[in-house]
């Protein structure tokens, strides 16, 4: 998708769709001039309440506008950045359905309601349009599509990829530079989120640990940051017992990918981001029920978010050093797979009783967290993981669970969540939960007694941060791959990319 900003008159804009955002506050007063310019009455406003994400498509009278359609889209009463993102997502999704490839967002229609500022709104609109226009159809052959034209060369169905080719923002002339700046950063962040979504949506037979490593390496090569990939022999020599144990049942070797973005000027801080990279989680010997197992291709969403965040940070040239760490494997049942009751030794030297092989994510994260703390001594460690179904039970599909041993870090993450709309809710790390993960035969168990499953998982991870004083764990099990109808998107959402980038920008 290309972007542009303009201050041309409405009548001069050549587009497939003109989009007018309106607040629910003072709707009729703001919308009437737009409808008049399109040769329409106020009557359609009876069907449009302008709640965030509401849309209404109308058809101008001939000769009034060059665009064949206009759309009213609601930004709610508050007009927050989250509301603007919802508006852009809904508008872009509807535009794709209408096959409108050139769209214009008219910000003056908002009547000065772009409260967060033109630059921030422009950035959010681009991110939202990329989000709403996204379709994952790369694995469709098109052979069963009806009515498609055949190519002369191969006689196969030829279908244009769905999407938006050009997004233009119409702004006042005085705001042109701010709009262009915001659109540029929005394109970077939105594209990084889209890349993460593509990775999450790939099925297990198309994405293995090696493919995650290749994706990180390709990003590093293109955007100028270092990537090192440790493979099975190196992982074994480092005695990363958690990653090795989870991989035992797999035919595909594990990888441990290290991304290292170093700014050109002296870094203001060093932040370690750790992403869980389980490319498919069958549960191992403690096998999952068949219902919904196909969605376990998304168990590497934390890894995808970390790759996206590091990529965006590099492209935005943030003045913070970022270490991205991704332990990756699938979790499969096999004669050689780890078994319930096994005791393994992690990279830290801490021994773990495997109470359940389906609690595998915390085992590979244990190695990565200790590695991050000991090798890099970062100013903060943040891990993202689709760790527990218990987090979905507690918070649903639109909110991630947040745990931290540092109030300032937790507050910064909560602030970034408010700014981006990628919602988090902090849960406790009280010592009393340690009782639930005690083991009689090892230092700790990877499963807890009944109840508080998302908390006991976080308490397990806490034991592997090597005493680090500034650590946060974000359980993204719900929002990374929402159930159908549970959120504004189906499939992989790329949750965490925008959250992390906003956090890193504020850090700098």
From Swiss-Prot:
Catalytic activity: Release of an N-terminal amino acid, Xaa-|-Yaa-, in which Xaa is preferably Leu, but may be other amino acids including Pro although not Arg or Lys, and Yaa may be Pro. Amino acid amides and methyl esters are also readily hydrolyzed, but rates on arylamides are exceedingly low; Release of an N-terminal amino acid, preferentially leucine, but not glutamic or aspartic acids
Main location (coarse class): cytoplasm
GO MF annotations, alphabetized: manganese ion binding; metalloaminopeptidase activity
Subcellular location: Cytoplasm
Cellular component GO terms, alphabetical: cytoplasm
Documented EC number(s): 3.4.11.1, 3.4.11.10
Keywords: Aminopeptidase, Cytoplasm, Hydrolase, Manganese, Metal-binding, Protease
GO biological process: proteolysis
Active site: 288, 362
Domain of life: Bacteria
HAMAP family from the UniProt entry: Cytosol_peptidase_M17
Name of the protein in its database record: Probable cytosol aminopeptidase
Gene that this polypeptide is encoded by: pepA
């Amino acid at each position: 998708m290309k972007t542009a900003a303009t201050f041309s008159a409405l009548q001069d804009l050549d587009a497939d769709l003109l989009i007018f955002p309106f607040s629910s506050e003072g709707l009729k007063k703001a919308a009437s001039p737009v409808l008049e310019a399109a040769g329409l009455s106020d009557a359609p406003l009876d069907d449009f309440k302008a709640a965030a994400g509401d849309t209404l498509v109308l058809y101008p009278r001939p000769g009034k506008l060059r665009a064949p359609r206009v759309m009213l889209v609601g930004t709610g009463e508050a007009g927050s950045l989250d509301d603007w993102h919802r508006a852009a997502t809904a508008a872009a999704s509807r535009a794709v359905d209408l096959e409108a490839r050139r769209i214009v967002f008219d910000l003056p229609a908002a009547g000065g309601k772009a409260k967060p500022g033109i630059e921030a709104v422009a950035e959010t609109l681009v991110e939202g349009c990329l989000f709403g226009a996204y379709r994952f159809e790369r694995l469709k052959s098109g052979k069963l599509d009806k009515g498609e034209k055949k190519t002369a060369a191969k006689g196969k169905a030829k279908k244009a990829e769905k999407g938006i080719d050009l997004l233009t923002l119409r702004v006042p002339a005085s705001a042109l530079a701010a709009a262009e700046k915001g659109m540029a950063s929005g394109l970077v962040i939105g594209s990084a989120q889209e890349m993460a979504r593509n990775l999450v949506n790939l099925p297990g037979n198309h994405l293995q640990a090696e493919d995650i490593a290749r994706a990180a390496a390709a990003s590093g090569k293109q955007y100028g940051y270092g990537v090192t990939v440790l493979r099975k022999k190196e992982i074994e020599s480092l005695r990363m017992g958690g990653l090795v144990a989870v991989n035992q049942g797999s035919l595909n070797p594990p990888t441990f990918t290290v991304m290292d973005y170093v700014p050109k000027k002296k870094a203001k801080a060093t932040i370690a981001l750790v992403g869980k990279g389980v490319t498919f989680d069958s549960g191992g010997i403690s096998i999952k029920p068949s219902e919904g197992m196909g969605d376990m291709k998304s168990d590497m969403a934390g890894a995808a978010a970390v790759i996206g965040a590091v990529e965006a940070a590099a492209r935005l040239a943030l003045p913070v050093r970022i270490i991205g760490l991704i332990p990756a494997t699938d979790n499969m049942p096999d004669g050689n797979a780890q078994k319930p009751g096994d005791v393994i030794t992690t990279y830290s030297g801490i021994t773990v009783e495997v109470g359940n092989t389906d609690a595998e994510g915390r085992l590979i994260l244990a190695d990565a967290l200790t590695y991050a703390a000991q090798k890099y001594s970062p100013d903060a460690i943040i891990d993202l993981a689709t760790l527990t179904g218990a987090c979905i039970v507690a918070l649903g599909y639109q909110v991630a669970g947040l745990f931290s041993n540092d109030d300032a870090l937790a507050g910064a993450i909560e602030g970034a969540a408010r700014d981006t709309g990628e919602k988090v809710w902090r849960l406790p790390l009280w010592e009393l939960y340690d009782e639930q993960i005690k083991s009689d035969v090892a230092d700790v168990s990877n499963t807890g007694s009944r109840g508080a499953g998302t908390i006991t998982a976080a308490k397990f991870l806490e034991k592997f941060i090597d005493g680090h004083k500034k650590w946060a764990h974000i359980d993204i099990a719900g929002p990374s791959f929402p159930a159908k109808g549970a959120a504004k998107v189906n499939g992989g959402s790329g949750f965490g990319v925008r959250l992390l980038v906003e956090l890193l920008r504020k850090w700098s």
